[in-house]
């Protein structure tokens, strides 16, 4: 960075160069899966990158915040710096999830009896935690089903699917990758797709967007999203924005499994 600046006769403490270093640091950070950085850490990292004192970068950062090129949010008194689109995505997700959880619960008449019938049909009894998850999936608008390998997530999902289908609910099964979607389809015996295929990617105008969005909602009653740990903040924002007001979402995953490639640890943050 220094040699390029010298070649083009750019002063080391030029305002544009300082601001570019801050943006580069946050974008690099996003590429490593993080949506923000504490202010102090951002200044130190950018300082090491362009060999300028943190004090000069602090002035550039304040200007970026003033012009809203960057955004700041306090957590426990510590200022965290965001790229605007990532903060907007986080806040949008939080607002939509809050709206889902505050919505009235769904009625499920004869649920315990239907679970018993399912157990007789399957030839085995569900564990108490599995039954609790099944009940919540049938009554709650937003549910996280989590656990490590071998904890019965697939068995629980299949029970939920059977009960939803018995009620003629329209269910969309999806996962963040093609491999995960194929595995979900094999384990459930039902069609599953990637989130991108479910939302239908639109390349019109050279900008990647989705045909299904907050103005063209998905026509389903329940979305079951597998491998939630791999879903980044922007993709989850796109999915949850495309849900109808009455649509429910069931998120399945293991927070200790593969993280998302893009920024954001959605599953881990929801669990916490």
Regions found by a protein language model. Give the residues of each.
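Conserved ATP-binding/catalytic motifs of P-loop helicase motor domains
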Residues: 1-272
């Amino acid at each position: 960075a220094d040699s390029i600046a010298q070649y083009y006769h750019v002063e080391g403490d030029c305002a544009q160069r300082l601001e570019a270093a801050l943006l580069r640091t946050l974008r690099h950070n996003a590429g490593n899966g993080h949506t923000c950085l504490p202010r102090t850490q951002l200044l130190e990292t950018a300082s090491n990158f362009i060999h300028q004192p943190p004090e000069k970068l602090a002035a550039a950062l304040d200007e970026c915040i003033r012009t809203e090129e960057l955004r700041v949010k306090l957590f426990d008194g510590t200022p965290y710096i965001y790229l605007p689109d990532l903060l907007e995505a986080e806040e949008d997700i939080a607002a939509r999830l809050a709206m889902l959880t505050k919505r009235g619960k769904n009625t499920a008449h004869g649920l315990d009896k239907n679970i018993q019938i399912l157990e007789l049909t399957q030839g085995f009894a569900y564990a108490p935690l599995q039954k609790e998850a099944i009940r919540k999936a049938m009554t709650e608008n937003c549910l996280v089903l989590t656990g490590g390998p071998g904890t019965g997530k697939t068995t629980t999902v299949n029970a939920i699917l059977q009960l939803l289908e018995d009620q003629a609910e329209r269910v969309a099964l999806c996962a963040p990758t093609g491999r995960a979607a194929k595995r979900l389809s094999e384990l459930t015996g039902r069609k599953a797709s990637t989130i991108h295929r479910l939302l239908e990617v639109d390349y019109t105008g050279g900008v990647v967007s989705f045909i299904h969005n907050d103005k063209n909602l998905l026509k389903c009653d329940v979305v079951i999203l597998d491998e939630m740990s791999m879903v980044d903040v922007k993709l989850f924002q796109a999915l949850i924005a495309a849900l109808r007001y009455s649509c429910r979402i069931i998120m399945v995953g293991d927070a200790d499994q593969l993280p998302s490639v893009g920024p954001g640890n959605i599953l881990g943050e929801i669990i916490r």
